[in-house]
Amino acid sequence: MRTIVLFMLALPVAAQAPVDEAKALKEHLLANYTKFEYAIPMRDGVKLFTVVYTPKDTSKTYPFLMTRTPYGVGPYGVDAMPLRQLPSPAFWKAGYIFVHQDVRGRMKSEGQFLHARPHNPSKKAAADIDESSDTFDSLDWLVKHVPGHNGKAGMVGISYPGFYTACGMIDAHPALKAVSPQAPLIDYLDGDDCRHNGAFLLAHNFRFFGMFPKLNPKMYASKDSRDPDYGTPDGYKFFLDLGPLSNADQKYLKKAEPFWQDQMDHGDYDDFCKARDLRPHIKNIQPAVLTVGGWYDAEDLAGTFYCYERVKATSPQCPQNVIVMGPWVHGGWARGDGDALGPVKFNAKTADYYREKVELPFFEHHLKGVATDPLPKAALMFETGTNRWRRFDT
C-alpha cells in the first residue's frame, strides 16, 4: 500500500534540546535573567505584546536581540521561563537582552493581523503602518525604556519570523545593526510557502491554514492537538478522497482562515499577490545581513536566495551581506547537530558548526565589537557529496 506522510508546513522552528539540556537552560535563565512583559505602543496607538529577558548582571551593557513572530512568545507570565527559544542556548550564555514579540493582531497583541502584510513605502500618517514601522516603533520604545543596553540591536527569525526580520531591515531603526533572515518568506505567493512557481502547495497550505487560526496563548498550557481527526495517516488517500478543492474549506477549514479563500480568489499573480512580494522594497539596507537557508528546504528555499540577491543588488553600502547554505531541511540548522539527513551522512556536525562558528560570531561582532574569524565576503556553502564547507568572496 502506498503511504505518504500526511502534511508538511512551515511551522515555528526552535532548537529541540534534549530534556536534560532544556532543564539546564531553564535553570540558567532563572539564575541569570529577569523576564518582563510590556505592551509597546505603535504610532497608530495599537499595542504589541512584548517579552524582554534582561541579564541580572548589571555590571555591563548588552545589545538587544529581537524575534517577532505570529506563533506566540509563550509561556506567558513573568515567572514562566521558556524551555526553548531562538536562537541557540549559546546566546543566552553570551549575554543579550532578548526581545520576543507577538506581531500585530496575534496572540496577546492588539490590532488586525494580515498574512505577509504588504509593505507601505509611502507612509504619511500615523495610520500608515506595516511590519517595518512596527519594528521601528518597537525598537525606538525599547532603547528609551529598557535600561542596561549598549545602543545596538539585532534581529533573527526563521520562516515566518524570518519574514518579519527581513521587513525590519527595511527603513531600519538606527539602533538595528545586524539581522539574520533565515528561510524567510519573501514572495509568499510565488516561490515561498503558498505557491512554488505558481503551483499551489495543497498539503502545506491545508494543514498550515487549518492550524494557524487555532493558535492562542492558552495552547501553551494545553496538550490539545492543533489538528482535527483526518481519519487516515495516508496523505495520498486523504486528498484523493477529499474531492473538489472547495471541500477543504467546507469540511475542515470552515472559513476560519480568510487567507485560504484569498488564495482561491487570486490564482493568478495579480496585484493582490504582487503587493506581498517584499523584493521591490529590499533596498538601501543599512544593517549587516546574514541570510541562512537549507538545500533541502521544502518551504522557503526561494526566499533565502531572493533576500540575499536583493541586498546584493540594491545595497552596496550594507556593511556585510553573506548567505549561508547547509544540508538542512526547513530550520534544520536550529536543531540537532546536522550530521545527517535521514540515512544520508555528511560526516560533519554542520548545524553545530553553523551555530557556534557563524551565527553567534556574526552577532557578537556587529553588536558587541568582538573580534571574530571573518566570514567570506559573499557565501558559505556546504557542498554535499564532498561533504565540506566552501567559502566564496564573490
What would you call each of these model-derived segments?
Residues 17-46, 174, 258-274, 278, ...:
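Alpha/beta-hydrolase-fold serine-hydrolase catalytic core, especially in secreted/extracellular enzymes
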Residues 81-84, 93, 115-118, 125-128, ...:
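Accessory cap/linker subdomain of secreted extracellular hydrolases
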